[in-house]
Amino acid sequence: MKASVTILGFRHSVYQRVARIALHEKNVEFRVKEVDPFDPEEAERLRDLHPFGRVPVLRHGSFDLYETSAITRYVDAAFDGPRLVPEDPRAAARMAQAIAVVDAYGYWPMIRQVFARRVFAPNEDSACNEAEVARGLAASRTVIEALEAIAADGRILTGDAITLADCHLGAMMDYFTRAPEGAALIQSQPHLDSWWRRMRARPSITGLDQQRR
């Protein structure tokens, strides 16, 4: 498919970054249109495309799609390039499991509590809430240990064949490990640490802070 691809998203959104990683790994050319869902006027306009006023939204020609997992599945199915969903049913199941774990149990403690309080808030000249960071780290440990077990299984998160799980986790880990406590927690898990050392060197990760326009 050759129609133009645009990601509508907020530059700080981890899920906008998930979508961008998938597009990059699929070798799809795309542009990013900055939309701030926290701005009331922009959020209201965004509801024309997303009834809940969230990001990201993918626009592919006349086709609009919201919800990150739907976007990444579409990107893998609609475009040529490396497969991001394994053919092996057990590997595909592990991929779906890892995504479900990090979305359901990892996003809030890893991103909203640890990263947002330890890294983002000080960068915005706000005080770090140490109690919130501690609570986030405690909850994150269970998530990281679950992901370590999935990585140890050897079907996904190897750093070799990239799947949609790498895209979801890559965006989360990029933020989480910017907090020293997050980086230390990952380093304590040998399989996950090995995966992250390889994943973080990929252009899809190293280019996240340079947003295409």
Language-model regions, residue ranges each:
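Terminal-tail/helix-coil boundary detector
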Residues: G207-R213
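GST-like domain detector, emphasizing the conserved glutathione-binding G-site
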Residues: M1-A134, R155
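A late-sequence structural motif
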Residues: R202-P203
